Amino acid sequence: MSLLTEVETPIRNEWGCRCNDSSDPLVVAANIIGILHLILWILDRLFFKCIYRLFKHGLKRGPSTEGVPESMREEYRKEQQSAVDADDSHFVNIELE
């Protein structure tokens, strides 16, 4: 039985585990993997908006809009959204130079 399924009980005023194979390398590896999984899961739940926004938008950034008036930004967004090929309804990629 691994440490992951054992129940810790008070033994002689100390907390211990009733298992003889706690030094088994497989048990140690399973415990490390379990702890890492728990840490990663907690971080994912805490920062999922930041993480997935970074993957979704951060890796493929568009042209810089710094110094461009808001009206021109809105016009560019509308052009990007309406850039559809009428023949087969596939999106057309517009690259500005």
UniProtKB/Swiss-Prot annotation:
Topology relative to the membrane: Single-pass type III membrane protein
Record topology, Virion surface segments: 1-22
GO cellular component, one term: membrane
InterPro entries (UniProt xref): Flu_M2
Covalent lipid adducts (S-palmitoyl cysteine), residues: C50
Positions bearing the site annotation: Seems to be involved in pH gating: W41
Region of interest called Disordered, as start-end residue ranges on this chain: 59-85
Listed transmembrane segments: 23-43
Oligomer status and interactors: Homotetramer; composed of two disulfide-linked dimers held together by non-covalent interactions. May interact with matrix protein 1.
Swiss-Prot/TrEMBL domain comment: Cytoplasmic tail plays an important role in virion assembly and morphogenesis.
Leftover remarks: When the channel is activated, one or more imidazole moieties of His-37 probably become bi-protonated.
Protein purpose: Forms a proton-selective ion channel that is necessary for the efficient release of the viral genome during virus entry. After attaching to the cell surface, the virion enters the cell by endocytosis. Acidification of the endosome triggers M2 ion channel activity.
Protein name: Matrix protein 2
Organism: Influenza A virus (strain A/USA:Huston/AA/1945 H1N1)
